[in-house]
A protein has these predicted regions:
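Phosphate/oxyanion-binding active-site loops and adjacent basic polyanion-contact surfaces
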Residues: 68-72, 149-161, 474-483
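A catalytic-pocket lid/entrance helix-loop region that shapes and gates access to the active site
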Residues: 199-317
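Gly/Ala-rich beta-loop-alpha elbow adjacent to hydrolase catalytic centers
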Residues: 182-186, 190, 194, 434
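Catalytic-loop region of hydrolases
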Residues: 2-120, 131, 433, 483-502
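Alpha/beta-hydrolase fold nucleophile elbow
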Residues: 172-185
């Protein structure tokens, strides 16, 4: 394989928002980890790491209309039920923005703790992702704004609720306590589902769920400030080198044959059209490195060493050959894009046949303002420009974003009061190395809406499978989560016995 075509999906909104401007412009905002693999398929030739059966369920296309509309088939995965008994606990993972097999393979925590509770494990796929395509195919589902109009978080939550209700009835287990799980976007869904449908599940673990990353609830520069701080804490000289590299890229790109030189220097499969393509490619690498800065080797996105930012900065700081700045930047980025050394050239082009589902979501409901500050960020400075953002969404999908809809639907500036008044049994776990933690719940809301925060945690690291290299703080974090879930289930059965003894 001579091209790393899977990189295409890592470059956030590149096809939507590519721009040569670096200030007061709409730049490609970052995606969640799952978005990077929204269109990728797991390796079907290797067996899944956990035992489960693939099943399908007929869902209504529109849960909020009584008009006759077609149904679609939703995929879900059911774990081994050897230890599960009727009315026993159900652990339900709310599907992210991608193929559900991939999330099941990378959420070892749920599989590992399920036997301790004799729980049945369910992973449900999100509509419009993986095999759960309305209208029978992705091409037809993604055809236009009309065919994608049912592609919303509200419809997805209703899918999960209907599926769970039907499943419990078919299993004759209407009294089974359900615990919701999710990381990143799925963590947001788990928290929102617990709020919106509290009768369906007794609690939710929402890992790395940035439910506050809307409107101006948190400063728009928060995400890139955290990424920058991750690099600064590792090496100030590395941080400074990356910050200087953007001007170096632009200067070389403007000279005669400069784009050709850059294309050769960064081993690109095709000649650059502009320097912004390369800047976006590098920005994506730095952002995702911050998300997956795990304390153990991982292959969650790409094969990476433990603490990959440390390794990137080693290459940028310690070049024995005395290479120039951009050569060192390429060497650092290669830790992310080519740690195995198997890639001969890099393809920066996005999918020519269409846009990913997450781009649609970001152009409709999931509007998360992002900017990069001159003072604290190592990235090119820019301001969030909603007008430009909206124009690109109209151009791409013929839709106008609704930046206030998610806060209207699930709680905005008063989300803490809403959680305290109406919420219960929700764990918000965040690691402060994760750039999405800036939009997360970082303090306890009430006795039962709990924030578990780790200083050295990255993006939903707690949901990954356990490893001998796990640091003590990660072991203790997972133990705390298990104890809280035990309490929810114990209280549920206690109340149920009390109710039936009356």
């Amino acid at each position: 394989m001579t091209k790393l075509f899977s990189l295409l999906l890592v470059i956030s909104f590149l096809s939507l928002f590519s721009s040569a401007a670096t200030s007061s412009s709409s730049r490609p905002p970052p995606k969640f980890l799952g978005s990077a693999f929204a269109r990728s398929k797991p390796n079907r030739n290797s067996p899944p790491p956990y035992r489960y059966e693939t099943r399908y369920f007929r869902q209504n296309l529109d849960h909020f209309s009584f008009a006759p509309l077609p149904q679609f088939t939703q995929r879900y995965l059911v774990g081994s039920s050897d230890k599960w008994s009727r009315n026993g606990p159900i652990f339900f993972y709310c599907g992210n923005e991608g193929d559900i097999d991939w999330f099941a393979a990378n959420t070892g925590f749920v599989w590992e703790i399920a036997p301790k509770f004799s729980a049945l494990v369910i992973f449900a796929e999100h509509r419009y992702y993986g095999e759960s395509m309305p209208y029978g195919s992705q091409e037809r589902a993604y055809k236009d704004a009309k065919s994608m109009s049912y592609f919303t978080t509200e419809q997805a939550l209703a899918d999960f609720t209907v599926l769970l209700t039907d499943l419990k009835q078919n299993l004759s287990s209407e009294e089974s306590p359900v615990v919701l799980f999710g990381g990143s976007y799925a963590g947001m869904l788990a928290a929102w589902m617990r709020l919106k449908y509290p009768h369906v599940a007794i609690g939710a673990l929402a890992s790395s769920a940035p439910i506050l990353q809307f409107e101006d609830i948190v400063p728009p520069e928060t995400f890139y400030d955290i990424v920058s701080n991750d690099f600064r804490r590792e090496s100030l000289s590395c941080f400074e080198a990356i910050k200087k590299s953007w001007d170096a890229l632009d200067r070389l790109g403007k000279v005669h044959d400069g784009l050709t030189s850059l294309s050769r220097k960064f081993r690109l499969c095709h000649k650059l059209n502009n320097t912004q393509q390369l800047s976006d490619w590098l920005s994506s690498a730095y952002s995702y490195l911050a998300m997956v800065n795990y304390p153990f080797p991982s292959g969650f996105m790409m094969p990476l060493p433990a603490y990959p930012i440390k390794e990137v900065c080693k290459r940028i700081d310690n070049d024995p050959n005395g290479n120039d700045l951009l050569d060192r930047i390429f060497a650092g980025a290669s830790i992310y894009y080519n740690y195995t050394g198997n890639v001969s050239c890099f393809d920066l082009d996005d999918d020519p046949h269409g846009l990913s589902g997450w781009d649609w979501q970001a152009c409709t409901e999931m509007v998360m303002p992002m900017s990069s500050s001159r003072e604290n960020s190592m990235f090119q400075p820019y301001d969030f420009d909603y007008t430009a953002y909206k124009e690109q969404c109209v151009q791409s999908y013929n839709v106008t974003p609704r930046p206030r809809w998610m806060t209207t639907e699930f709680g905005g500036h008063d989300i803490r009061r809403a959680l305290k008044t109406f919420g219960s049994n929700i764990i918000f776990s965040n690691g402060l190395l994760d750039p999405w933690s800036g939009g997360g719940v970082l303090a306890n809301i009430s006795e039962s809406v709990t924030a578990l925060v780790t200083e050295l945690g990255a993006h939903h690291v707690d949901l990954r499978a356990s490893s001998p290299e796990d640091p003590q703080w990660l072991v203790e974090l997972r133990e705390s989560e298990v104890e809280l879930i035990k309490g929810w289930i114990r209280d549920y059965y206690k109340q149920r016995r009390k109710y039936f003894s009356m």
